[in-house]
């Protein structure tokens, strides 16, 4: 056992030289604790037995300033040493390896000034001196300067002076201290912040019910507070909540007004409510029947109703009278027993883009018009065979008289040829298209139309002399080997395109190669046989009544006196663009379908003369120029 020397001047360098009693039954922990205390420059007294520590305290309590004791001791409980230390008015620090809540709470309740957990750190031991100062404030106050020593609270001094031998204070002193504390609390209550009111859902429902009962205009905080009758709620709380509630209602009203304002055109002008619905086409078709000429002038536009220009609705395109401006003239033509061909407009053409036709109310509206002048069906020369068939461009379909769509019909032949077509066609070479494996009748089509889908050509012409399996593809045959259903051409119907806005039939220059690709020269015998078959016309008078001009395509059973030479045309393929010189002459008696008194200046004669001049001057005439087309596609 070691005892630190006590000196009268120990407070001069406090906490250096503070006397500490260390008690622990574990020698390792005790040695570690001693080293740390010495590093703090404390005077250390250590022991491993609690009984010896008690004897030292009882002999001279003024020998130590602080006691550090382990809780668990083998001979005596650590709390027993704590009680003795408190009797001697010494600060006691409990040391233990257990850091649980119950152990710490037990040590603090029994009077320990601090509770340290093993292993103890250096910083913790450096701050244990303030416990000594708390117990001896009067003695350690002398260490302070005179100015600071006077500022020590008087209450602490009184309490320290009136401490009796047992360490208890008088009851009167406690009452005085309680009264002073209550007065201080009362003085601070005026400056204390008021508790905040939390508006729960139930409290807000009572508030809303009170406002609805009074009315929003007459609701004031005092009346609302009386109706709510809730303790702890002040008038200021109700006033603040009422202001927030009114702002909330104002925002809701503004949001509803914004939703009701039209914003389709990026503006809030209420005048857009007065706009009519997009239903102009119904009024357009019901107001006036479109004239058959296919052209609307300004006088026609002024008679139409105004809603036509204000809006356009695609639902108004159901009426067939808006599209088919010439359908009512020749739609009732019937097939005669002599084999008259019919050409009519489709009543089901609906997919037409009308926005391009109605760009301005002051511009004349042009509607589709079928315009074709066809001359007499006579025996023509080689030039008519080479050029007139391509210029006619009459698409022959099945017996169906309607098209599903003008823009999607695969059999519709369009052209950019703007001159009236007075050229007659002759010598059309048909071909048979089909597959050998198909047991049905082969499909019959004209040359140049083979690039189009052939689903609507089925059933037009049936062959009786050739079985389907024995005919190769694109095989040329003679007209006398083909029979038509009903021994006439009454069942065959030609369709006229209503797609051209200019009113004239057009043909795509890209179709030239397709038309002329398969018009290969046959043997002299085959051409002569074909020409011979044309001498006796078995079909009688063939007419092509067109709805726009009522021009008739006739054959007056005139005989063909001129034969066709086998050198009529050279083979044309994708790499050749020239046609050989024809060897036959034109029929001088060829006339157009006009009356005799109107034949002084025939357009057909002018066209044929121009073609002869070009052939004589150039020798070899390009295909595109030969047939009346430019060598490049029109813009």
UniProtKB/Swiss-Prot annotation:
Molecular function terms, GO-annotated: DNA binding; DNA-binding transcription factor activity
Question: Which part of the chain is the Response regulatory domain?
Answer: 19-133
Q: Which residues bind DNA?
A: 196-246
Q: Which cysteines are joined by disulfide bonds?
A: none
Q: Compositional bias (Acidic residues) at which positions?
A: 166-186
Q: Which residues cross the membrane?
A: none
- Assembly behavior: Binds the target DNA as a monomer.
What name does UniProt use for this protein?
A: Two-component response regulator ARR18
User: Which species is this record about?
Assistant: Arabidopsis thaliana (Mouse-ear cress)
Per the record, the gene is ARR18
């Amino acid at each position: 056992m070691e005892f630190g020397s006590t000196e009268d001047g120990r407070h001069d360098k406090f906490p250096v030289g503070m006397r500490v009693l260390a008690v622990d039954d574990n020698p390792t922990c005790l040695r570690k604790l001693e080293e740390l205390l010495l590093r703090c420059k404390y005077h250390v007294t250590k022991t491993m037995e609690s009984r010896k520590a008690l004897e030292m305290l009882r002999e001279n309590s003024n020998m130590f300033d602080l006691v550090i004791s382990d809780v668990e001791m083998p001979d005596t409980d650590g709390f027993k040493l704590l009680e003795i230390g408190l009797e001697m008015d010494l600060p006691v620090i409990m040391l233990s390896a257990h850091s649980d809540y119950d152990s710490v709470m037990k040590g603090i309740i029994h009077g320990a000034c601090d509770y340290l957990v093993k292993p103890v750190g250096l910083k913790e031991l450096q701050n244990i001196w303030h416990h000594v100062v708390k117990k001896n404030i009067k003695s350690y106050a002398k260490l302070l300067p005179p100015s600071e020593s006077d500022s020590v609270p008087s209450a602490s001094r009184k309490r320290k002076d009136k401490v009796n031998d047992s360490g208890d204070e008088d009851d009167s002193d406690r009452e005085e201290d309680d009264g002073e504390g209550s007065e201080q609390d009362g003085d601070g209550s005026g400056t204390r912040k008021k508790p905040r009111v939390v508006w729960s859902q139930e409290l807000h429902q009572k508030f809303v019910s009170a406002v609805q009962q009074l009315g929003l205009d007459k609701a004031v905080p005092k009346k609302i507070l009386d109706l709510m009758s809730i303790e702890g709620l002040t008038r200021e709380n109700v006033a603040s909540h009422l202001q927030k509630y009114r702002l909330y209602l104002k925002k809701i009203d503004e949001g509803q007004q914004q939703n009701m304002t039209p914003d389709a055109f990026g503006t809030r002008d209420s005048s857009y409510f007065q706009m009519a619905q997009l239903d102009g086409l119904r009024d357009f078709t019901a107001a006036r029947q479109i004239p058959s000429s296919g052209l609307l002038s300004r006088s026609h536009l002024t008679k139409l109703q105004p809603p036509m220009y204000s809006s356009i609705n695609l639902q108004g395109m159901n009426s067939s009278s808006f599209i088919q401006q010439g359908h009512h003239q020749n739609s009732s033509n019937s097939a005669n027993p002599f084999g008259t061909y019919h050409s009519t407009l489709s009543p089901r053409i609906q997919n037409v883009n009308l926005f391009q036709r109605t760009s301005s109310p002051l511009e004349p509206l042009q509607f589709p018009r079928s315009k074709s002048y066809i001359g007499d069906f006579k025996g023509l020369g080689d030039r008519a065979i080479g050029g007139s068939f391509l210029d006619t461009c009459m698409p022959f379909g099945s017996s169906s008289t309607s098209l599903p769509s003008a823009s999607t019909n695969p059999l519709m032949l369009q052209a950019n040829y703007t001159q009236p077509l007075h050229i007659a066609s002759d010598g059309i070479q048909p071909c048979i298209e089909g597959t050998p494996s198909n047991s049905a009748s082969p499909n019959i089509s004209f040359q140049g139309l083979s690039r189009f889908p052939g689903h609507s050509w089925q059933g037009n012409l049936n062959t009786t002399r050739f079985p389907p399996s024995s005919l190769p593809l694109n095989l040329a045959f003679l007209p006398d080997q083909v029979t038509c259903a009903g021994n006439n051409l009454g069942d065959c119907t030609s369709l006229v395109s209503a797609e051209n806005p200019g009113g004239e039939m057009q043909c795509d220059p890209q179709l030239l190669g397709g038309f002329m690709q398969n018009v290969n020269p046959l043997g002299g015998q085959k051409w002569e046989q074909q020409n011979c078959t044309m001498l006796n016309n078995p079909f009688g008078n063939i007419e092509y009544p067109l709805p726009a001009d009522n021009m008739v395509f006739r054959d007056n059973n005139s005989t063909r006196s001129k034969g066709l030479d086998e050198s009529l045309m050279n083979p044309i393929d994708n790499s050749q663009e020239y046609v050989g010189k024809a060897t036959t002459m034109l029929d001088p008696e060829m006339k157009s379908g006009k009356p005799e008194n109107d034949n002084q200046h025939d357009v057909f004669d002018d066209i044929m003369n121009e073609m002869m001049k070009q052939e004589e001057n150039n020798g070899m005439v390009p295909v595109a120029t030969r047939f009346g087309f430019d060598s490049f596609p029109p813009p």
